[in-house]
Amino acid sequence: MSKKPTVLMILDGYGLNDKKEGNAVYLAKTPVMDKLMAEYPFVKGNASGLAVGLPDGQMGNSEVGHMNMGAGRIVYQELTRITKEIQDGDFFKNEALLAAMKNAKENNSAVHFMGLLSDGGVHSHNTHLYGLLEMAKREGVEKVYVHCFLDGRDTPPASGKEFVEALEAEMKKIGVGEIATVSGRYYAMDRDNRWDRVELAYNALTTGEGVKGTDAPAAVQASYDNDKTDEFVLPTVIEKDGQPTGVISDKDSVVFFNFRPDRAREITRAFCDDDFQGFERKARPHVTFVCFTDYDDTIQNKQVAFHKVQLHNTFGEYLAAHNMTQARIAETEKYAHVTFFFNGGVEEPNKGEDRILVKSPKVATYDLQPEMSAPQVCGKLVDAIKSDKYDVIVINFANPDMVGHTGVQEAAIKAVETVDECVGKAVEALKEVDGQMFICADHGNAEQLIDYETGAPWTAHTTNPVPFILVNADPKYTLRENGCLADIVPTLIQLMGMEQPAEMTGKSLLVEK
């Protein structure tokens, strides 16, 4: 029996936008896609925000998109996951966080919360700190101190004072907590082994050395008056009655509420590593130290509140378990996406998984060669479809995204037209072997190349919907509206007449006519 391949085709960065201006997808000549949308089941799918496990309204990206697709479930990114746990109440049952509270109560010691105080959502979120304060109140911890690292990169450069004032209002409302120190992220969150900076922040936290102040908002204002905005605020110790409010000492608990690891590692090592080499520590308090996420396996003496979610039974694993063959095809720029990210962050290929890599062209920017390597990628796809070797083929065309990032409209139009031709060749090959295909995108990009408010070039991703098209499948099916990327693989599994595994919580898009 010959194999009838099922193809998942991802047009990277190919969104749908009602506006025509600066819309390369609309301005390009796309006879193939136009025909497919007219003749086959076609709906708009969601590829941004909560639909892909990101905060509401946040644009999607390729890593998140491919991970959601391959997992067949919404994969919550750390920010959303922690926020969701606070809302659901699971946060308040977290074992590592409860252990930090318990340690302080048993030793009549303090709990210190440190981290980036902003709503930037890149490294941390201030609502997560508010959740910790609420937890401390519920658990009856009395000595609670906050060490504020000020942002000014993922938020406006002089917004820190407002965040400090909002924190003070929140602590008053909850009924627990005092601000002990404020430091710019330049010092507390270095990631380039500039230990002299980290040392200043660490000393403020552990010895009470640094600039002195009696009121946190006033201390931040004084820094502004000195032409040092949030990021560069010198480590400042807030004093009460001439003494530091809350120095981190033996038997205390420390919770570092940043969830992104890269800028959290260095100061964490200063607290946790026995063989720390960064600088001579004036104080080495022995504390219960809890990191929000696992910043690094090699950091010693730490606990982790939110472990990385291991994804079991991704599409690749599922196919391998059913002794089915699969091909992953992409050019260099998107090769990791159809392999590592599609497999849930796992590098090793599955049994029966062939990986076909086409090199991306060596040009300074892709507007200089908007075709990129799409013709060669298409050739490999057609060969794979006709090879009688594969049950499933996952293919990515990088052009609309990579050329869209240049913001050059003519080039982006050419990129979209190139991909349209490739889709046409794939459909022809597919019909010859009576295969079926699902066409989608991982997020938008090429459909918006200008900022509609300012008229300036727009080179980022978008929150626009993406096309979902079902090609040459059983004609009794159409597609439902309001689907998301996590629903695609459950759709393919149903098309192949197989049983959806329990781990996949996405829902098939198929509807019988």
PLM features per residue range, with description:
Residues 1-513:
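Feature captures the catalytic ectodomains and active-site-proximal regions of enzymes
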